[in-house]
Amino acid sequence: MYSTLTGREDELVPLHPDGVLRMYVCGMTPKFHPHIGHARTFVAMDVIRRYLLYRGYRLKHVQNFTDIDDKIIERAQREQRDVESTAREYMQSYLAVMDRLNVQPADAYPTVTGFMERIVEFIAGLVESGHAYAVDTGDVYFDVASFPDYGKLSHRDLNSQLVAARKELEPGKRDPRDFALWKRAREGEPAWPSPWGRGRPGWHIECSAMARETLGDQLDIHGGGADLIFPHHENEIAQSESLTGKEPFVRHWAHSGLVVLGGGEKMAHSLENFTTIDTILERYTPLEVRYFLVATHYRSSLTFTLEGEAGDVRVRGIEDARGALGRLRRAFGEEPLSLDGPLDQAAVDGFNAAMDADFNTPDALAVIFDLAREINRCRDSGAAPAELDRRRRTLVHLLEVLGLDIRAEGPAEQGSIEPYVDLLLEVRRKLRDLKQWALADEIRARLGDLGVTVEDQPGGGSTWRLER
Protein backbone atom coordinates (compact mmCIF):
# COMPACT_ATOMS: atom_id res chain seq x y z
CA MET A 1 0.00 0.00 0.00
CA TYR A 2 1.35 3.40 -1.02
CA SER A 3 1.80 6.11 1.59
CA THR A 4 2.09 9.81 0.82
CA LEU A 5 4.47 10.09 3.78
CA THR A 6 7.14 7.72 2.43
CA GLY A 7 6.39 8.02 -1.28
CA ARG A 8 6.58 4.26 -1.71
CA GLU A 9 4.51 1.08 -1.45
CA ASP A 10 5.00 -1.03 1.67
CA GLU A 11 3.40 -4.24 2.85
CA LEU A 12 0.30 -3.60 4.93
CA VAL A 13 1.03 -5.20 8.32
CA PRO A 14 -1.23 -4.30 11.27
CA LEU A 15 0.43 -1.97 13.79
CA HIS A 16 -1.35 -3.37 16.82
CA PRO A 17 -1.04 -6.79 18.51
CA ASP A 18 -4.77 -7.50 18.13
CA GLY A 19 -4.32 -7.49 14.34
CA VAL A 20 -7.16 -5.03 13.77
CA LEU A 21 -6.42 -2.28 11.25
CA ARG A 22 -7.33 1.21 12.43
CA MET A 23 -8.63 3.28 9.50
CA TYR A 24 -9.65 6.92 9.84
CA VAL A 25 -11.09 8.90 6.93
CA CYS A 26 -11.61 12.65 6.97
CA GLY A 27 -15.29 13.07 6.29
CA MET A 28 -17.43 15.80 4.87
CA THR A 29 -18.10 19.29 6.18
CA PRO A 30 -21.90 19.24 5.80
CA LYS A 31 -22.47 22.69 4.33
CA PHE A 32 -24.41 21.52 1.25
CA HIS A 33 -25.34 18.38 -0.66
CA PRO A 34 -22.36 16.18 -1.62
CA HIS A 35 -20.86 16.59 -5.07
CA ILE A 36 -19.00 14.16 -7.34
CA GLY A 37 -15.67 15.18 -5.76
CA HIS A 38 -16.89 13.91 -2.40
CA ALA A 39 -18.08 10.69 -4.01
CA ARG A 40 -14.65 10.24 -5.59
CA THR A 41 -12.95 10.17 -2.19
CA PHE A 42 -15.48 8.10 -0.30
CA VAL A 43 -16.00 5.49 -3.02
CA ALA A 44 -12.19 5.14 -3.24
CA MET A 45 -11.93 4.60 0.52
CA ASP A 46 -14.86 2.17 0.35
CA VAL A 47 -13.04 0.07 -2.26
CA ILE A 48 -9.92 -0.02 -0.07
CA ARG A 49 -11.97 -1.10 2.92
CA ARG A 50 -13.93 -3.73 0.96
CA TYR A 51 -10.79 -5.24 -0.50
CA LEU A 52 -9.01 -5.44 2.84
CA LEU A 53 -11.99 -7.24 4.38
CA TYR A 54 -12.17 -9.55 1.36
CA ARG A 55 -8.48 -10.42 1.84
CA GLY A 56 -9.08 -11.38 5.46
CA TYR A 57 -7.96 -8.31 7.36
CA ARG A 58 -9.97 -7.17 10.36
CA LEU A 59 -10.64 -3.46 10.35
CA LYS A 60 -12.29 -0.65 12.27
CA HIS A 61 -13.28 2.30 10.10
CA VAL A 62 -14.07 5.74 11.56
CA GLN A 63 -15.13 8.76 9.51
CA ASN A 64 -15.91 12.14 11.03
CA PHE A 65 -18.28 14.97 10.25
CA THR A 66 -17.04 18.53 10.76
CA ASP A 67 -20.42 19.80 11.92
CA ILE A 68 -19.27 23.22 13.09
CA ASP A 69 -17.31 25.38 10.65
CA ASP A 70 -17.25 28.91 9.22
CA LYS A 71 -18.86 27.72 6.00
CA ILE A 72 -21.70 25.93 7.80
CA ILE A 73 -22.33 29.09 9.80
CA GLU A 74 -22.42 31.11 6.57
CA ARG A 75 -24.85 28.63 5.00
CA ALA A 76 -27.12 28.71 8.05
CA GLN A 77 -27.17 32.52 8.04
CA ARG A 78 -27.95 32.56 4.31
CA GLU A 79 -30.80 30.09 4.80
CA GLN A 80 -31.94 31.88 7.98
CA ARG A 81 -31.85 28.88 10.27
CA ASP A 82 -29.68 27.47 13.04
CA VAL A 83 -26.31 25.83 12.48
CA GLU A 84 -27.29 22.50 14.06
CA SER A 85 -30.24 21.83 11.74
CA THR A 86 -28.22 22.94 8.72
CA ALA A 87 -25.42 20.49 9.47
CA ARG A 88 -27.90 17.72 10.30
CA GLU A 89 -29.72 18.08 6.98
CA TYR A 90 -26.56 17.83 4.90
CA MET A 91 -25.17 14.96 6.98
CA GLN A 92 -28.35 13.03 6.21
CA SER A 93 -28.04 14.02 2.56
CA TYR A 94 -24.50 12.63 2.50
CA LEU A 95 -25.49 9.33 4.11
CA ALA A 96 -28.43 8.88 1.73
CA VAL A 97 -26.30 9.53 -1.36
CA MET A 98 -23.52 7.20 -0.20
CA ASP A 99 -26.10 4.48 0.41
CA ARG A 100 -27.30 4.86 -3.19
CA LEU A 101 -23.69 4.55 -4.39
CA ASN A 102 -23.30 1.34 -2.35
CA VAL A 103 -20.73 2.84 0.01
CA GLN A 104 -20.70 0.76 3.19
CA PRO A 105 -21.24 2.81 6.36
CA ALA A 106 -18.31 3.48 8.68
CA ASP A 107 -18.22 1.80 12.07
CA ALA A 108 -18.51 5.23 13.70
CA TYR A 109 -19.28 8.79 12.59
CA PRO A 110 -17.97 11.11 15.33
CA THR A 111 -18.84 14.80 15.14
CA VAL A 112 -16.98 17.84 16.38
CA THR A 113 -19.88 18.96 18.57
CA GLY A 114 -20.13 15.48 20.07
CA PHE A 115 -16.42 15.37 20.99
CA MET A 116 -15.95 18.91 22.26
CA GLU A 117 -14.70 17.91 25.73
CA ARG A 118 -12.07 15.58 24.25
CA ILE A 119 -10.95 18.27 21.83
CA VAL A 120 -10.50 20.76 24.68
CA GLU A 121 -8.53 18.14 26.65
CA PHE A 122 -6.28 17.50 23.65
CA ILE A 123 -5.54 21.23 23.27
CA ALA A 124 -4.84 21.54 26.99
CA GLY A 125 -2.33 18.70 26.71
CA LEU A 126 -0.50 20.50 23.91
CA VAL A 127 -0.38 23.72 25.94
CA GLU A 128 0.94 21.89 29.00
CA SER A 129 3.67 20.16 26.97
CA GLY A 130 4.85 23.42 25.38
CA HIS A 131 3.63 22.67 21.87
CA ALA A 132 0.84 25.26 21.97
CA TYR A 133 0.24 28.64 23.55
CA ALA A 134 -2.76 30.78 24.46
CA VAL A 135 -2.94 34.51 23.72
CA ASP A 136 -4.80 37.30 25.47
CA THR A 137 -7.61 37.29 22.92
CA GLY A 138 -8.68 33.77 23.96
CA ASP A 139 -7.20 32.07 20.90
CA VAL A 140 -4.82 29.11 21.17
CA TYR A 141 -2.16 28.35 18.54
CA PHE A 142 0.05 25.37 17.78
CA ASP A 143 3.73 26.27 17.95
CA VAL A 144 5.05 24.91 14.63
CA ALA A 145 8.68 25.60 15.59
CA SER A 146 8.29 23.12 18.47
CA PHE A 147 7.82 20.24 16.00
CA PRO A 148 11.02 19.82 13.93
CA ASP A 149 9.45 17.30 11.54
CA TYR A 150 6.77 19.72 10.37
CA GLY A 151 6.42 19.39 6.59
CA LYS A 152 7.36 15.71 6.34
CA LEU A 153 4.03 14.64 4.85
CA SER A 154 3.79 17.34 2.20
CA HIS A 155 7.59 17.32 1.76
CA ARG A 156 7.90 21.05 2.40
CA ASP A 157 10.74 22.71 4.26
CA LEU A 158 10.12 25.15 7.08
CA ASN A 159 11.88 28.07 5.38
CA SER A 160 9.69 27.93 2.27
CA GLN A 161 6.61 27.68 4.48
CA LEU A 162 7.74 30.74 6.40
CA VAL A 163 8.02 32.75 3.19
CA ALA A 164 4.64 31.51 1.96
CA ALA A 165 2.94 32.33 5.27
CA ARG A 166 4.49 35.79 5.69
CA LYS A 167 1.71 38.23 6.51
CA GLU A 168 0.56 40.50 9.31
CA LEU A 169 0.35 38.40 12.47
CA GLU A 170 -2.79 38.09 14.54
CA PRO A 171 -2.39 39.64 18.02
CA GLY A 172 -0.12 37.45 20.15
CA LYS A 173 0.74 35.00 17.39
CA ARG A 174 4.46 34.14 17.39
CA ASP A 175 4.98 32.78 13.91
CA PRO A 176 2.93 33.12 10.70
CA ARG A 177 2.99 29.32 10.30
CA ASP A 178 1.32 28.72 13.66
CA PHE A 179 -2.26 27.57 13.23
CA ALA A 180 -5.34 27.92 15.42
CA LEU A 181 -6.32 25.15 17.81
CA TRP A 182 -9.03 27.18 19.54
CA LYS A 183 -10.79 30.31 18.28
CA ARG A 184 -12.43 32.82 20.58
CA ALA A 185 -16.20 33.19 20.41
CA ARG A 186 -17.67 35.67 17.96
CA GLU A 187 -21.03 37.31 18.50
CA GLY A 188 -23.97 35.29 17.21
CA GLU A 189 -21.96 32.10 16.61
CA PRO A 190 -22.06 28.80 18.54
CA ALA A 191 -19.44 28.58 21.30
CA TRP A 192 -18.33 26.15 24.01
CA PRO A 193 -16.54 26.64 27.36
CA SER A 194 -12.78 26.11 27.66
CA PRO A 195 -9.91 27.13 29.98
CA TRP A 196 -9.20 30.00 27.54
CA GLY A 197 -12.77 31.29 27.36
CA ARG A 198 -15.74 30.45 25.21
CA GLY A 199 -15.02 29.56 21.60
CA ARG A 200 -14.77 26.66 19.19
CA PRO A 201 -12.01 24.47 17.74
CA GLY A 202 -9.81 25.26 14.80
CA TRP A 203 -10.15 23.00 11.78
CA HIS A 204 -7.28 20.55 12.30
CA ILE A 205 -7.44 19.66 15.99
CA GLU A 206 -10.79 17.90 15.69
CA CYS A 207 -9.45 14.97 13.65
CA SER A 208 -6.46 14.40 15.93
CA ALA A 209 -8.76 14.28 18.95
CA MET A 210 -11.49 12.14 17.38
CA ALA A 211 -9.02 9.69 15.83
CA ARG A 212 -7.25 9.24 19.16
CA GLU A 213 -10.47 8.79 21.12
CA THR A 214 -12.01 6.25 18.69
CA LEU A 215 -8.94 4.39 17.38
CA GLY A 216 -5.98 5.11 19.66
CA ASP A 217 -2.66 6.92 19.38
CA GLN A 218 -1.50 5.29 16.15
CA LEU A 219 -3.41 4.46 12.98
CA ASP A 220 -2.72 1.98 10.21
CA ILE A 221 -4.50 3.98 7.50
CA HIS A 222 -5.63 7.58 7.26
CA GLY A 223 -7.57 8.53 4.14
CA GLY A 224 -8.86 11.67 2.50
CA GLY A 225 -8.67 13.76 -0.63
CA ALA A 226 -5.31 14.94 -1.95
CA ASP A 227 -6.31 18.53 -1.17
CA LEU A 228 -6.07 17.69 2.55
CA ILE A 229 -2.36 16.78 2.49
CA PHE A 230 -1.45 20.35 3.39
CA PRO A 231 -2.27 21.90 5.70
CA HIS A 232 -4.85 19.61 7.30
CA HIS A 233 -3.06 16.28 7.46
CA GLU A 234 0.32 17.90 8.00
CA ASN A 235 -1.14 19.63 11.03
CA GLU A 236 -2.74 16.44 12.29
CA ILE A 237 0.67 14.76 12.37
CA ALA A 238 2.20 17.69 14.26
CA GLN A 239 -0.60 17.74 16.83
CA SER A 240 -0.83 14.00 17.41
CA GLU A 241 2.87 13.15 17.52
CA SER A 242 3.56 16.17 19.75
CA LEU A 243 0.95 15.08 22.29
CA THR A 244 1.58 11.31 22.35
CA GLY A 245 5.29 11.20 21.52
CA LYS A 246 4.56 8.20 19.30
CA GLU A 247 5.70 7.86 15.69
CA PRO A 248 4.28 7.35 13.23
CA PHE A 249 0.85 8.78 13.95
CA VAL A 250 -0.20 7.06 10.72
CA ARG A 251 1.66 4.32 8.84
CA HIS A 252 -0.17 4.58 5.50
CA TRP A 253 -1.55 7.91 4.26
CA ALA A 254 -4.03 7.21 1.43
CA HIS A 255 -4.96 10.26 -0.63
CA SER A 256 -7.48 10.08 -3.45
CA GLY A 257 -6.90 12.12 -6.58
CA LEU A 258 -9.05 15.18 -7.14
CA VAL A 259 -11.93 15.49 -9.57
CA VAL A 260 -10.95 18.10 -12.13
CA LEU A 261 -13.03 19.76 -14.81
CA GLY A 262 -12.20 19.59 -18.49
CA GLY A 263 -9.97 22.65 -18.17
CA GLY A 264 -8.02 21.17 -15.26
CA GLU A 265 -9.73 23.18 -12.51
CA LYS A 266 -10.42 21.41 -9.22
CA MET A 267 -14.10 20.86 -8.41
CA ALA A 268 -15.07 22.35 -5.04
CA HIS A 269 -17.97 23.90 -3.14
CA SER A 270 -15.79 26.95 -2.50
CA LEU A 271 -15.26 27.50 -6.23
CA GLU A 272 -18.98 27.02 -6.96
CA ASN A 273 -18.13 24.81 -9.93
CA PHE A 274 -19.50 21.57 -8.57
CA THR A 275 -22.21 19.18 -9.72
CA THR A 276 -24.13 17.43 -6.94
CA ILE A 277 -24.47 13.68 -7.02
CA ASP A 278 -28.25 13.99 -6.84
CA THR A 279 -28.14 15.97 -10.09
CA ILE A 280 -25.98 13.32 -11.77
CA LEU A 281 -28.29 10.55 -10.56
CA GLU A 282 -31.18 12.20 -12.38
CA ARG A 283 -29.58 10.96 -15.62
CA TYR A 284 -27.40 8.01 -14.61
CA THR A 285 -27.87 5.01 -12.36
CA PRO A 286 -25.90 4.70 -9.11
CA LEU A 287 -24.09 1.69 -10.59
CA GLU A 288 -22.94 3.70 -13.61
CA VAL A 289 -21.68 6.52 -11.40
CA ARG A 290 -19.85 4.12 -9.09
CA TYR A 291 -18.22 2.33 -12.02
CA PHE A 292 -17.02 5.68 -13.37
CA LEU A 293 -15.40 6.42 -10.00
CA VAL A 294 -13.88 2.97 -9.56
CA ALA A 295 -12.41 2.66 -13.06
CA THR A 296 -9.59 5.16 -12.37
CA HIS A 297 -6.82 4.39 -9.86
CA TYR A 298 -7.68 6.05 -6.57
CA ARG A 299 -4.52 8.20 -6.50
CA SER A 300 -5.02 9.55 -10.03
CA SER A 301 -6.99 12.67 -10.79
CA LEU A 302 -10.37 12.06 -12.39
CA THR A 303 -11.57 14.27 -15.24
CA PHE A 304 -15.23 15.25 -15.16
CA THR A 305 -16.31 16.52 -18.57
CA LEU A 306 -19.83 17.76 -19.25
CA GLU A 307 -21.03 17.57 -22.85
CA GLY A 308 -24.20 18.52 -24.67
CA GLU A 309 -26.60 21.40 -24.26
CA ALA A 310 -28.99 22.49 -21.54
CA GLY A 311 -31.58 19.80 -20.98
CA ASP A 312 -29.35 17.09 -22.45
CA VAL A 313 -26.08 17.32 -20.52
CA ARG A 314 -23.95 14.19 -20.44
CA VAL A 315 -20.78 13.11 -18.62
CA ARG A 316 -18.37 11.46 -21.03
CA GLY A 317 -16.82 9.10 -18.47
CA ILE A 318 -20.18 7.92 -17.18
CA GLU A 319 -21.39 7.33 -20.73
CA ASP A 320 -18.34 5.08 -21.15
CA ALA A 321 -19.19 3.36 -17.86
CA ARG A 322 -22.70 2.68 -19.15
CA GLY A 323 -21.27 0.91 -22.19
CA ALA A 324 -18.80 -1.10 -20.10
CA LEU A 325 -21.50 -2.27 -17.72
CA GLY A 326 -23.66 -3.29 -20.66
CA ARG A 327 -20.88 -5.54 -21.92
CA LEU A 328 -20.45 -7.11 -18.49
CA ARG A 329 -24.19 -7.70 -18.11
CA ARG A 330 -24.35 -9.27 -21.53
CA ALA A 331 -21.50 -11.63 -20.66
CA PHE A 332 -23.18 -12.60 -17.40
CA GLY A 333 -26.38 -13.41 -19.27
CA GLU A 334 -29.76 -14.29 -17.88
CA GLU A 335 -29.40 -18.00 -17.17
CA PRO A 336 -30.14 -19.04 -13.58
CA LEU A 337 -26.98 -19.20 -11.44
CA SER A 338 -26.14 -20.34 -7.94
CA LEU A 339 -23.46 -18.18 -6.34
CA ASP A 340 -22.35 -21.12 -4.19
CA GLY A 341 -19.71 -23.16 -5.94
CA PRO A 342 -16.16 -23.11 -7.30
CA LEU A 343 -14.57 -20.02 -8.83
CA ASP A 344 -12.16 -19.54 -11.72
CA GLN A 345 -8.92 -19.47 -9.73
CA ALA A 346 -6.82 -17.96 -12.52
CA ALA A 347 -9.14 -14.95 -12.70
CA VAL A 348 -9.21 -14.62 -8.91
CA ASP A 349 -5.41 -14.72 -8.76
CA GLY A 350 -5.11 -12.10 -11.49
CA PHE A 351 -7.62 -9.83 -9.76
CA ASN A 352 -5.87 -10.21 -6.40
CA ALA A 353 -2.47 -9.48 -7.94
CA ALA A 354 -3.80 -6.23 -9.40
CA MET A 355 -5.50 -5.09 -6.22
CA ASP A 356 -2.55 -6.14 -4.05
CA ALA A 357 -0.49 -3.53 -5.92
CA ASP A 358 -1.94 -0.50 -4.10
CA PHE A 359 -5.56 -1.25 -5.06
CA ASN A 360 -5.03 -1.00 -8.82
CA THR A 361 -8.66 -1.01 -9.96
CA PRO A 362 -7.93 -0.39 -13.67
CA ASP A 363 -5.82 -3.55 -13.83
CA ALA A 364 -8.40 -5.44 -11.76
CA LEU A 365 -11.15 -4.41 -14.19
CA ALA A 366 -8.95 -5.54 -17.10
CA VAL A 367 -8.88 -9.01 -15.52
CA ILE A 368 -12.66 -8.89 -15.16
CA PHE A 369 -13.14 -7.98 -18.83
CA ASP A 370 -10.80 -10.79 -19.87
CA LEU A 371 -13.06 -13.08 -17.87
CA ALA A 372 -16.15 -11.64 -19.58
CA ARG A 373 -14.64 -12.38 -22.98
CA GLU A 374 -13.86 -15.93 -21.85
CA ILE A 375 -17.50 -16.34 -20.78
CA ASN A 376 -18.65 -15.24 -24.22
CA ARG A 377 -16.27 -17.72 -25.87
CA CYS A 378 -17.51 -20.53 -23.62
CA ARG A 379 -21.11 -19.72 -24.41
CA ASP A 380 -20.43 -19.54 -28.16
CA SER A 381 -18.50 -22.81 -28.18
CA GLY A 382 -21.13 -24.71 -26.21
CA ALA A 383 -18.91 -25.35 -23.18
CA ALA A 384 -20.24 -27.49 -20.35
CA PRO A 385 -22.72 -25.60 -18.14
CA ALA A 386 -20.52 -26.14 -15.08
CA GLU A 387 -17.58 -24.42 -16.82
CA LEU A 388 -19.75 -21.50 -17.89
CA ASP A 389 -21.27 -21.13 -14.42
CA ARG A 390 -17.86 -21.19 -12.75
CA ARG A 391 -16.77 -18.20 -14.80
CA ARG A 392 -20.08 -16.35 -14.44
CA ARG A 393 -19.98 -16.88 -10.68
CA THR A 394 -16.44 -15.48 -10.58
CA LEU A 395 -17.50 -12.43 -12.57
CA VAL A 396 -20.16 -11.55 -10.00
CA HIS A 397 -17.83 -12.34 -7.09
CA LEU A 398 -15.00 -10.07 -8.26
CA LEU A 399 -17.27 -7.19 -9.21
CA GLU A 400 -18.88 -7.30 -5.79
CA VAL A 401 -15.46 -6.85 -4.17
CA LEU A 402 -15.43 -3.46 -5.93
CA GLY A 403 -18.99 -2.75 -4.80
CA LEU A 404 -20.39 -3.29 -8.31
CA ASP A 405 -23.45 -5.53 -8.60
CA ILE A 406 -24.38 -5.98 -12.25
CA ARG A 407 -27.52 -7.85 -11.19
CA ALA A 408 -28.85 -4.89 -9.21
CA GLU A 409 -30.27 -2.83 -12.06
CA GLY A 410 -31.61 -5.45 -14.41
CA PRO A 411 -30.25 -7.32 -17.43
CA ALA A 412 -29.05 -5.73 -20.63
CA GLU A 413 -31.81 -4.63 -22.98
CA GLN A 414 -32.64 -7.03 -25.81
CA GLY A 415 -32.27 -4.26 -28.35
CA SER A 416 -28.75 -3.30 -27.28
CA ILE A 417 -26.48 -2.23 -30.13
CA GLU A 418 -23.32 -2.98 -28.18
CA PRO A 419 -22.55 -6.47 -29.53
CA TYR A 420 -22.83 -5.16 -33.09
CA VAL A 421 -20.60 -2.16 -32.45
CA ASP A 422 -18.05 -4.39 -30.73
CA LEU A 423 -18.09 -6.74 -33.72
CA LEU A 424 -17.54 -3.86 -36.16
CA LEU A 425 -14.67 -2.53 -34.08
CA GLU A 426 -13.07 -5.97 -34.04
CA VAL A 427 -13.30 -6.06 -37.85
CA ARG A 428 -11.90 -2.52 -37.97
CA ARG A 429 -8.98 -3.53 -35.75
CA LYS A 430 -8.09 -6.38 -38.10
CA LEU A 431 -8.30 -4.03 -41.09
CA ARG A 432 -5.88 -1.65 -39.38
CA ASP A 433 -3.51 -4.54 -38.67
CA LEU A 434 -3.59 -5.23 -42.43
CA LYS A 435 -2.99 -1.51 -43.09
CA GLN A 436 -6.38 -1.19 -44.81
CA TRP A 437 -6.64 2.36 -43.53
CA ALA A 438 -9.35 3.58 -45.91
CA LEU A 439 -11.78 0.79 -44.98
CA ALA A 440 -11.01 1.23 -41.28
CA ASP A 441 -11.67 4.97 -41.53
CA GLU A 442 -14.91 4.33 -43.40
CA ILE A 443 -16.21 2.08 -40.60
CA ARG A 444 -15.37 4.78 -38.07
CA ALA A 445 -17.06 7.47 -40.17
CA ARG A 446 -20.20 5.39 -40.76
CA LEU A 447 -20.45 4.62 -37.05
CA GLY A 448 -20.15 8.36 -36.43
CA ASP A 449 -23.09 8.95 -38.76
CA LEU A 450 -25.09 6.58 -36.56
CA GLY A 451 -24.18 8.48 -33.40
CA VAL A 452 -21.34 6.20 -32.26
CA THR A 453 -18.09 8.04 -31.46
CA VAL A 454 -14.97 5.86 -31.72
CA GLU A 455 -11.74 6.87 -29.99
CA ASP A 456 -8.49 5.03 -30.72
CA GLN A 457 -6.23 4.37 -27.74
CA PRO A 458 -2.44 4.00 -27.47
CA GLY A 459 -1.50 0.38 -28.10
CA GLY A 460 -4.11 -0.23 -30.77
CA GLY A 461 -7.36 -0.61 -28.84
CA SER A 462 -10.50 1.49 -29.26
CA THR A 463 -13.31 2.71 -27.06
CA TRP A 464 -16.70 3.95 -28.13
CA ARG A 465 -19.70 5.76 -26.76
CA LEU A 466 -23.19 6.40 -27.99
CA GLU A 467 -23.99 10.09 -28.40
CA ARG A 468 -27.55 10.44 -27.16
Regions found by a protein language model. Give the residues of each.
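Alpha-helical recognition segments enriched in aromatics with Gly/Pro capping
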Residues: M1-K31, D46, E117-E335
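N-terminal, positively charged nucleic-acid-binding surface of large information/translation enzymes
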Residues: T6-N102, G459, T463-W464
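Alpha-helix C-terminal capping/helix-coil junction sites
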Residues: L53, D99, V127-E128, A254, ...
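Short phosphate-binding/catalytic loops that engage adenosine nucleotides
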Residues: Y57, H131, V452
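Short, glycine/charge-rich beta-strand/loop segments that flank catalytic centers
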Residues: F65-D70, M91-Y94, Q104-I119, T137-S146
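The substrate-binding groove and active-site-proximal loops of carbohydrate-active enzymes
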Residues: A76-V83, D107-T113, G225
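Structural preference for alpha-helix termini/caps and helix-kink/transition segments
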Residues: E265-A268, N273-R468
